[in-house]
From Swiss-Prot:
Modifications made to the protein after synthesis: Methylated by PrmC. Methylation increases the termination efficiency of RF1.
Family membership noted in the UniProt record: Belongs to the prokaryotic/mitochondrial release factor family.
Cellular component terms (Gene Ontology): cytoplasm
Protein name: Peptide chain release factor 1
Top-level taxon in the UniProt lineage: Bacteria
Modified residues (N5-methylglutamine): 233
Gene: prfA
UniProt xrefs under Pfam families: PCRF (PF03462), RF-1 (PF00472)
The species this protein was found in: Staphylococcus aureus (strain NCTC 8325 / PS 47)
Role: Peptide chain release factor 1 directs the termination of translation in response to the peptide chain termination codons UAG and UAA.
Keywords (A to Z) from UniProt: Cytoplasm, Methylation, Protein biosynthesis
Subcellular location: Cytoplasm
InterPro entries recorded: PCRF, Pep_chain_release_fac_I, Pep_chain_release_fac_I_sf, Prokaryotic/Mito_RF, RF-1
Keyword Acetylation: no
Record GO terms (molecular function): translation release factor activity, codon specific
Amino acid sequence: MFDQLDIVEERYEQLNELLSDPDVVNDSDKLRKYSKEQADLQKTVDVYRNYKAKKEELADIEEMLSETDDKEEVEMLKEESNGIKAELPNLEEELKILLIPKDPNDDKDVIVEIRAAAGGDEAAIFAGDLMRMYSKYAESQGFKTEIVEASESDHGGYKEISFSVSGNGAYSKLKFENGAHRVQRVPETESGGRIHTSTATVAVLPEVEDVEIEIRNEDLKIDTYRSSGAGGQHVNTTDSAVRITHLPTGVIATSSEKSQIQNREKAMKVLKARLYDMKVQEEQQKYASQRKSAVGTGDRSERIRTYNYPQSRVTDHRIGLTLQKLGQIMEGHLEEIIDALTLSEQTDKLKELNNGEL
C-alpha cells in the first residue's frame, strides 16, 4: 500500500510542476486535465502526509522516552504516544479506501429514466413520486435538473419520463438507483382500503463524451413530429419533437420540448448515453457472472427497494437497510441511503483489493 502512496505523492508533485509550466498554463485543455487530476489526488496526498507526520512524531516520542527517567515526563510522553497509536489505524483504513480505484463515471452528469411497470395507473403515479423525490434530492445537492422527454398518464404521474441531472459527482450519488422500485400503499381510487403493490424501474445513465462512443451519421434515422400530452392532445402546433433511431441497434431517443434544435441536441445526448450504457451493461453482465457485488448486479429488473406507506418504511434489499423515514425520503432526503450504499460498495472493493482481485 505504501509503495502505491509514494507513487501517488510523486505524481502529485509532478502535477504541481506541470501546472506552473507556461506551456501548460497557455493550453486550456492540458490545464483542465492536469488540474482535475491533481484535485483527484489531493485528499489522498493530504491524508498520507498527515499519516507520515504522525509516524515521525511517534518516532520522536519513542526516542525521547528512551532518553528520560523523569516520571512526569514519561507519563506525558506515553499519553501522547498512545493518542497517536490510536489514530494511526484509522488513517490507514482511510488510506486503503482512498486507494480504491474510482469509478471513471462518478464525476459525470446523468440521464435518469423512470418507467411505470406493474400496477397500471398507480405505477404511473409512483413514477411521478420518484421523479419528484430525485428532483428534490438534486436540488439539495446543488445539481440542475431538466426534463428531456415525458409521457404523462391520464390519471397523474408518468408512463415514462427521462431527465438530465447536471453537477459535479451526479453519477456517484445516483448510480445506486438503477433497478426496480416497489411501492405498497392504498391508492386514492381504492374505496375498499386494500393495499396495492406497484413498481417502477429506474435507469441512471452517465452522459458520455464523443470520444467515448462513436456514432456514424449514416447509422441514424431522424424523424420530427408533433408532441402530445396526457390524453393525446397536441402540445405544439409545429413538428418540433424529435425522434432519433440508431439503426444498427434499434435504440431510440426522443425529446419533445418547444425548440426543434434543442430537441435534437437532447435526443442525441440521450442516445449516446443509452448506447454507452448498453456497452457497459454487457461488460457488467460478464463480471456479474463471476462475482455479485454487495450492492447488487445493477440489473434493471433487480428489485432494489420497497416503499411501504402504511408502515412509513423504506427497505433497500441490497444491503438490508430499513428506515422508518418514508416521508422524509420521498421529500428527497436520500443521503442516509446513498451513504450506506457507497460504504457497502467501498467495503466490497476493499475485500477484492485485499484478495488481490483488482
